[in-house]
Amino acid sequence: MRDRLAEVGFTEARADAIVASVSGDIDGSNAAELRRAVAERVPSTARSLIMDLTQTTYIDSTGIELLFELARRLSARRQIFTVVVPKGTGVRKVLELCDIGSVAVLVESQDDGLEAVDAA
């Protein structure tokens, strides 16, 4: 049995950057709930979304699909999508295998995410 289902918290790191910090497991049982939460908390006026997966312990194909969907939606709204996940973690390895870096900026920390927003 895996750890626990995902919990998400939102903060405004700066006026132009909303951070969604996800802890626990992202899978088919909660991806729709996570999708709704992000849709409700990230307005089209925000410049960027930083999805912090530092405390995410597991992600399945439904969670990966969610990240690609978010990337498409944010790109259509000309918003920057950054995913924070430390190197060497299982979640990072999965995301690299799925080439999430082709649709989002993949970084190791929230500070790196903010730098990516500044550079865009």
Identify the role of each PLM range.
Residues 1-2, 70:
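A short, flexible N-terminal coil/short beta segment enriched in small residues
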Residues 2-36, 53-55:
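STAS-typified acidic loop motif
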Residues 25, 87, 110-112:
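Short, solvent-exposed coil/turn elements at secondary-structure transition points
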Residues 28-104:
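Amphipathic alpha-helical interaction surfaces in cytosolic regulatory modules
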Residues 103-109, 113:
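Short acidic-hydrophobic, aromatic-tinged amphipathic segments that line or gate anion-handling sites
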Residues 113-120:
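A short, charged, amphipathic alpha-helix used as a generic interaction element across diverse proteins
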